Swiss-Prot record:
Keywords: Membrane, Transmembrane, Transmembrane helix. It comes from Saccharomyces cerevisiae (strain ATCC 204508 / S288c). It is found in: Membrane. GO terms for cellular component: membrane. It is a single-pass membrane protein. This is Putative uncharacterized protein YOR218C. It comes from the Eukaryota.
Length: 139
């Protein structure tokens, strides 16, 4: 029995990439790329499944104030829970004077009010903003 068949896949690519030096270098880079992808996937799994959530916010409401725009639905917000966490949320952002490091997310589908702790400042991106928050509680 060929025991090499049981090796982890990214260790096998260079072995099967024979021929010229450019091909061997390509195989080496492919090994590193696959290894990086595997590590990134594992890291993202622990981040998402460990009560961490990354939210792309298209717009923000201020409590007691006017909306900053028309679209307040988040995209790409997900956790490992099956309790409506896959649905879109509406983000409510308190005024700076009363800001207490929390994001209040009103779930559109389940009616729960979820509180998230803001861990980083908003990072502007194209068609939205990325915010990293920590799940605090559900009430």
């Amino acid at each position: 029995m060929n025991k090499s068949c049981f090796r982890f896949p990214f260790f096998a690519t260079t072995r099967f990439t024979g021929g010229s030096l450019p091909l061997r270098r390509f195989g080496f880079l492919l090994d590193k790329f696959i290894l990086l992808q595997v590590c990134a996937t594992i890291l993202c799994f622990f981040i998402i499944c460990g009560n961490w959530i990354v939210i792309c916010v298209n717009d923000i409401f201020e409590i007691g104030g006017a909306s900053t725009g028309a679209n307040t639905t988040t995209t790409n917000s997900t956790t490992c829970s099956v309790n409506c966490d896959w649905m879109c949320h509406t983000v409510v952002f308190p005024r700076e004077s009363t800001f207490n490091r929390s994001w209040y997310l009103f779930d559109n589908g389940c009616g729960h009010i979820r509180t998230y702790e803001k861990l980083h400042n908003r990072i502007p991106v194209f068609f939205g903003q990325i915010v990293i928050v920590h799940y605090l509680y559900d009430r």
